[in-house]
Each structure stands twice: as structure tokens, then as C-alpha cells.
Amino acid sequence: MAEKEHYERTKPHVNIGTIGHVDHGKTTLTAAITKVLAAKGLAKAEDYADIDAAPEEKERGITINTAHVEYETEKRHYAHIDAPGHADYVKNMITGAAQMDGAILVVAATDGPMPQTREHILLARQVGVQYIVVFLNKTDLVDDDELVDLVEMEVRDLLSEYDFPGDDVPVVRGSALKALEGDPEQEKVILHLMDVIDDYIPTPKRPTDKPFMMPVEDVFTITGRGTVASGRIDRGTVKVGDEVEIVGLTEDVLKSTVTGLEMFHKTLDLGEAGDNVGVLLRGISHDQIQRGQVLAEPGSIQTHKNFKGEVYVMTKEEGGRHTPFFSNYRPQFYFHTTDVTGTIELPDGVEMVMPGDNVTFTVNLQKPVALEKGLKFTIREGGHTVGAGVVSDILD
């Protein structure tokens, strides 16, 4: 048993999820995958009802229902998320409660692409999911193969419309329900789908391989040694002697060298993504660095004031606003570790935004912030979270 434990950790880890229109079979497919892989000793079979009764979670103050299942193929370990309701799915994507490296788009061959199919593809594009594999479900209910071909073409066109490689995206046809009921042919289809996912969705770059970045949470002075910035390393690694830049909240970028590194009050040789560390900085005084800035590998991140965001606006029940907002609304945007006031401009044709809406708008921040596409933020008003978003485009 102990050996197996060790083996499991050596497989590369990938996060995926099922997306698509309501009742097209996302949860049935999730259950079928666990059942078929369980028969090979690679998963624990999860019941449809268990997946569907997803527990509530809080992410950045927003309540989301999400089911998490895990399973393995010969090559990889997967964490798979399935969000039962459409609103849950939207919230999941935007808050980053479930970071997806790739997604399985489930489309019922009986219906073809529906409104939420389009919406989920758009969201996947906005939040940076780069790889989509299509499962054409319920093909057993369509007598005419040409109709299935037609649906496949429609799905490919739709993916191309949102800048996915529609012509190259793998499409697998089958029946998730039949596989779940034990039909041997359809069980083979599920195994084929997993092979396709293994091959098509690349193993993500580990956070430690990316350029160093740490949002600053706190700054203090150690007498006789200098200024320490503390925080959780977001990505990359850092060691004594590394050059870093202090970026954000001002137009100036300061350079410094790391002269000491501590974790849990012990010295550290190498800090890596996920570690909470204190970084001693050469030649930096206490008033030259503040919470909300980031320490980063030189040249790896810039400040911006204007961006486009994909946003979920919380409902009154979730603790959000009770009333709509309009262009020129000026809440605080919480990035990394600090609030910055920004002015919202709604897109043409959108007069106002209601609590519960999912919307794309542009923001002009009062101060420059270290921003990049894919960065998550919350929107706050008087200390309360009223929405969550992700940077979908930089505009300056």
C-alpha cells in the first residue's frame, strides 16, 4: 500500500471540469468516467446523486455548489469539477474556485449547441481555459449519423467563433448514460475519451517554473538588517542573491537584491510557490515598499490602470448589492492584497447591471496595479464583497 501511495504522487496532476448546457449530460458523464476507471482500480466510483448534490463552498465570500471528484488514468492524476447549476458554473469560472487546465464540453447530439453551450465557451475563453475536448452525448438517441455530423460541425464552428481551434479540437461521440449502465461498447468510448484528454490537454507548467512573483502583505524593519517584505509566493522561486523588482501602486519600479529569506522564523535557502516567506531587501527603506505591491523577477510584470474584466455580480442573498449599478460606478477593486478604487464603464447596449448578472466591462483604476490577463479580483463596497472577476484583457 505504501508503495502505491508513493506512485500516485509521481503522476502529473491536471485539473479539468465538465461544461455545457443544462441536461446535456455533464454529471452523467462525470459519474460514468469514475465508474469505468474504478473498474480498472484507478478511481472510486461516484454516484450521480452524490455528484449532483454538490456541497456548498465559499470562495471569496461567494457561495458555490461544486462537486469535486478525482480519478487517474495510466498517465495522470485528475481533479475533476462538475458544477450542477448554471449560476454555480459561472461563479466557479470567475472566482477561480476551480482552476481548470482544460474542459470537457458536453453537447447532446439530440439538441446541438444551446445558449449555455455558447456562454460556457465564452467564459472558458475569458478566464483562460485553453484546451477543450468535446463529448457529443446521447448519440444513441439520434438515428441519422448525418445529423450527428451536422451537430459536430456546429460545435466546431462555435468553438472557432470564440478563438478555440474548432477544426482541431477532438470530438468523441457516445452515450454517458449507457456507459454508466454498463454497456461494454460505451465503456470503451469513455476509456477512449480519457486517452484523448491525456493526449490533448497538456500537463500545465508547474507554478515553480514560472517567473517569481509575491504579493506583499506586510512590511517591517529588522534593526541593523533592513526592510523585510512578507507574503505568500504566488509563483516561481526566490533565493538569496536574486534581483527583484518592487512593482505596483506607483509608476516607479524599484530594483533590489534579496539578502535574506525566512520562513516560520527560520532561514530558508529557496522559497517556492505556495510558501509564506519574509524577504529581506537590500537598500530599501520601510517607506519605499507597501502592502499591495508585488515583488517580481525583473521585467516579468508591468503595472496597468485600464483593463477589461469578466465579472459575476453577487445577489442580495449572497450579501451583494440590493440595487443595480450603472456606468461610472466607483467601487474598490481588491487585487493581490489591497483595494484600489476604479471607475466602471459598461459596454454599449448595457444600461445597467443587476445583482446576479455576469457581465464584461472596462475599468479605469486610480492607481497603477501589477496586472496581467487571468488575474482574479473582488469588487468591494464599504468593506463588503459585491462581485468577483477576472482580468480578461489589458487595455493600456
UniProtKB/Swiss-Prot annotation:
Region feature (G4): 137-140
Region named G1: 20-27
Keywords: Cytoplasm, Elongation factor, GTP-binding, Hydrolase, Magnesium, Metal-binding, Nucleotide-binding, Protein biosynthesis
TM region(s), chain numbering: none
PANTHER family cross-referenced by the UniProt entry: ELONGATION FACTOR TU, MITOCHONDRIAL (PTHR43721:SF22), ELONGATION FACTOR TU-RELATED (PTHR43721)
Cross-referenced HAMAP family: EF_Tu_B (MF_00118_B)
The protein's assembly and partners: Monomer.
NCBIfam families: EF-Tu, PRK00049.1, PRK12735.1, PRK12736.1, small_GTP
Name recorded for this polypeptide: Elongation factor Tu
